Amino acid sequence: MSAGNIVEIIGAVVDVEFPRDAVPNVYDALRVEDSGLTLEVQQQLGDGVVRTIAMGSTDGMRRGVTVANTGAPISVPVGKGTLGRVMDVLGNPVDNAGDVQTEERWSIHRPAPSFDEQAGSTELLETGIKVIDLLCPFAKGGKVGLFGGAGVGKTVNMMELIRNIAIEHSGYSVFAGVGERTREGNDFYHEMKDSNVLDKVALVYGQMNEPPGNRLRVALTGLTMAEFFRDEGRDVLMFIDNIYRYTLAGTEVSALLGRMPSAVGYQPTLAEEMGVLQERITSTKKGSITSIQAVYVPADDLTDPSPATTFAHLDATVVLSRQIAELGIYPAVDPLDSTSRQLDPQVIGNEHYDTARAVQNTLQRYKELKDIIAILGMDELSEDDKLIVARARKIQRFLSQPFFVAEVFTGAPGKYVSLKDTIRGFQAIVAGEYDHLPEQAFYMVGTIDEAVEKAGKLK
């Protein structure tokens, strides 16, 4: 264990000088003697000086303070002791419930599983949300991204998925809150507690008020905990909210480290940093990690480098649209933009595939007719097109659904719709079996039977 002294402090970046024969390795954790603050080595500058990023506030720090090298990367507790606990980036508890009791600690920097260790899966994961199960089904052991701009419902969708999957799924879950609001973290904790699934969830938070070092590493902390459960042979759920903040923390750190920015001011190592995280979120022959990640889309621009880099790593993309949210249709999932690799007749079966494609074709045709309707009005359409518009509007409304986690806002009880009921409902609408019902009957209901019942009340 060598010791050095602080020579320069620029915000979250701290330069430390060590004896030349005892320079720490990149990613080694250093400990500041006075405050107990942890620093992570990012660069070796030469002449015994290393540039580090602080895992906490550098307020009140001064030059000359002694820093000890721990000789190892940051390690965090892993195992059953993490379940039901709220921890920070270093694995320290923040829930006032005593120390986290685990037998092992793992380094947060680990190699991704090798090619021959990985295992693919085509098994579907039912979410109980109609639009997702029908048009962008999730694979067990797959990676899913929830893309959306500010205020279109990423976190609410994420919480509904956690509620539906974590309650139905008997395994363990890990939630990494990366650079999000403390209020949302608090809401999520109480939601889990009220649902009695807190004892199966490990929570790791690095909120948006934390220094960039915390926000950059907190996703790796959560992932390390999930990897331990996977390597034990379990099926783990990994939730990350929000991947964009991980990228943003990387941008802040990159600028502080003096790297030249690339497109739109992002770090030049954007693709590599994203790859380091995403390549580790994978299923092996021992167990699986199914990950659901919220991705903020700056200014609703899906071609921005951050969301564009994330797209390449995902099996399914759920795109939330502001135009659909403006219509009052929640979840505001864009049925034409959202995609999944699972949407293949060999994986999901012909009935599901044909229904999904028929729904998308109807909605696409309606989208094309909207210009004609806006200029000439509905009366100028042919009878066939009028029928398509009527069915498309019913489909659009039937894609909405009341959420369990939104009960407190809407007063409407949440609905979980099985895949079988979802396919049956959309098949019937596309086939014209419900052409006689008003479109309002399909808004904010669960199954098609509820829509028929609602139509009876509307008459």
UniProtKB/Swiss-Prot annotation:
Q: Which residues bind ATP?
A: 148-155
Which reaction equations make up its catalytic activity? ATP + H2O + 4 H(+)(in) = ADP + phosphate + 5 H(+)(out)
- Which Pfam families does the record associate with it? ATP-synt_ab, ATP-synt_ab_N, ATP-synt_VA_C
How is this protein positioned relative to the membrane? Peripheral membrane protein
Q: Which UniProt keywords apply?
A: ATP synthesis, ATP-binding, Cell inner membrane, Cell membrane, CF(1), Hydrogen ion transport, Ion transport, Membrane, Nucleotide-binding, Translocase, Transport
What's the subunit arrangement here?
A: F-type ATPases have 2 components, CF(1) - the catalytic core - and CF(0) - the membrane proton channel. CF(1) has five subunits: alpha(3), beta(3), gamma(1), delta(1), epsilon(1). CF(0) has three main subunits: a(1), b(2) and c(9-12). The alpha and beta chains form an alternating ring which encloses part of the gamma chain. CF(1) is attached to CF(0) by a central stalk formed by the gamma and epsilon chains, while a peripheral stalk is formed by the delta and b chains.
Source organism lineage?
Answer: Bacteria, Pseudomonadati, Pseudomonadota, Gammaproteobacteria, Chromatiales
The gene behind this protein is atpD
Name-wise, this protein is ATP synthase subunit beta
